[in-house]
């Protein structure tokens, strides 16, 4: 059921973004009196699920959910309609319009996607505001993934600054270390200040981080599996584990370190229940689990809720949109640095779908839709033939040089671009499949 909800959110989100992206091309084409022959959500290779012709335009839904398109008269695009291009240009065709008009038509989808992202972020701030745990309330420091521990960080460290920039939100630490390729991490450890120097060439390892870090918390039971080993041992909700086989335990990560990879093994656990300390014996199962879920940081630290008026939400939403855009451009840049091996983390529809929550949450849905809208805008403006950016590149050449590239050249460029895009699509989704088997 979780997978179905994720797929549904992905399809709804992409459908919204694709329709509005193509609408950007469509509206500008009609403004400049260019005929649009087709307007499709998803591709209709061979057949369509639905179609209806209104005026000069056929509107439809294809069966292949890899995108969508508008077929603009007199334009060399993925339809590769050579017969139409052999005929004399007509006043209603794309090729008969001025270069600046054609440029605006090609930029229409990208502009709509970017403005849509800003609009969504504004509405998210207005509707839900922000809720977060201030860094000064995270009193026990953080628990780190192994790749960060390998840098010299220790569980319990409080991260104060990255490359001299004070940390404002703990959720951004993981992102900033990786994307900004942080060189110096300032931490507080046992009351002392330390600088952790990040060696060069760590990006490829850090890109493999899943959660990076989370606030460190005591090991308290939040849920017990019915008939699980911990429940059978007599444990209760809200019990705090403070010792394992005589070794004191202050935090959940310490409990995991003492019991991990031990299958079908009994442990003597010291448990704090209210003001009483109890001793219980609990065993791991064949998977090395006790059958309980721990409390998380939100159970220990009070959050701050910030509400925005509509006027206040406008700059907040715009800033969020530009921040996300800048971050994604930095991540995209990593793909062209072989030493980072960022290409190994490239994912397709499975990876995109996995970022949606397993339950339908409108705030997270709209945040993810805005994020994907920015990705769609950036990817489409890349100067690759067959993408909007490829057409923009050739139009800018025409405007600057005064010479229009020949139709044959544009046809060949379109073919090369389509092959490149299909190869990237295949590679990204193959990465997803390989990742599923690895997991």
What are these regions (language model features)?
Residues 2, 6-10, 97-106, 110, ...:
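Residue-level signature of transmembrane alpha-helical entry/exit and packing/kink sites
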Residues 2-85, 379-401:
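Small-residue-rich helix-interface/hinge motifs
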Residues 14-18, 71, 113, 372-381, ...:
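Alpha-helical transmembrane segments of multi-pass membrane proteins
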Residues 50, 107, 170-174, 198, ...:
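Short beta-alpha junctions and helix-cap segments that line functional grooves
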Residues 68, 72-143, 423:
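Internal alpha-helical transmembrane segments
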Residues 75-82, 92, 97, 142-201, ...:
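Juxtamembrane extramembrane loops of integral membrane proteins
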Residues 124-168, 205-243, 247-251:
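PDZ/PDZ-like domain segments forming the peptide/carboxylate-binding groove
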């Amino acid at each position: 059921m979780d997978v179905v909800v994720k797929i549904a959110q992905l399809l709804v989100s992409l459908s919204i973004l694709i329709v509005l992206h193509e609408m950007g091309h469509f509206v500008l084409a009609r403004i400049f009196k260019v005929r649009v022959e087709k307007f499709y959500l998803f591709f209709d290779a061979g057949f369509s699920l639905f179609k209806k012709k209104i005026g000069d335009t056929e509107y439809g839904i294809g069966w292949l959910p890899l995108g969508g398109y508008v077929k603009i008269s007199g334009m060399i695009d993925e339809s590769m309609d050579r017969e139409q291009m052999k005929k004399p240009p007509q006043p209603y065709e794309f090729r008969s319009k001025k270069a600046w008009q054609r440029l605006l038509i090609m930029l229409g989808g990208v502009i709509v996607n970017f403005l849509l992202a800003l609009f969504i972020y504004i509405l998210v701030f207005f509707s839900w505001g922000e809720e977060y745990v201030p860094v000064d309330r995270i009193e026990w420091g953080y628990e780190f993934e192994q790749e960060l521990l390998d840098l010299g960080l220790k569980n319990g460290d409080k991260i104060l600054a990255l490359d001299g920039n004070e940390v404002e939100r703990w959720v951004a630490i993981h992102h900033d270390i990786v994307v900004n390729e942080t060189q110096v991490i300032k931490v507080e450890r046992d009351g002392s200040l330390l600088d952790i120097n990040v060696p060069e060439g760590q990006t490829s390892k850090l890109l493999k981080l899943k959660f990076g870090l989370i606030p460190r918390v005591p090991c308290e039971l939040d849920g017990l599996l019915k008939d699980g080993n911990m429940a059978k041992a007599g444990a209760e909700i809200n019990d705090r584990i403070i010792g394992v086989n005589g070794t004191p335990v202050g935090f959940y990560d310490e409990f995991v370190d003492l019991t991990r990879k031990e299958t079908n093994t009994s442990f003597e656990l010291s448990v704090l229940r209210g003001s009483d300390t109890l001793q219980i014996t609990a065993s791991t199962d064949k998977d090395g689990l006790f059958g309980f879920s721990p409390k998380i940081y939100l159970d220990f630290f009070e959050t701050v809720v910030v509400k925005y008026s509509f006027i206040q939400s406008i700059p907040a939403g715009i800033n969020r949109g530009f921040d996300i855009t800048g971050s994604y451009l930095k991540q995209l840049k990593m793909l062209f640095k072989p030493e980072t091996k960022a290409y190994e983390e490239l994912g397709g529809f499975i990876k995109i779908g996995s970022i949606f929550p397993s339950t339908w949450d409108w705030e997270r849905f709209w945040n993810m839709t805005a994020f994907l809208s920015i990705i769609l805008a950036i990817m489409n403006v890349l100067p690759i033939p067959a993408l909007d950016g490829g057409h923009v590149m050739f139009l800018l050449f025409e405007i600057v040089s005064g010479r229009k590239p020949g139709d044959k050249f544009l046809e060949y460029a379109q073919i090369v671009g389509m092959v490149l895009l299909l190869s990237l699509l295949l590679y990204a989704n193959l990465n997803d499949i390989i990742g599923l088997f690895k997991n």
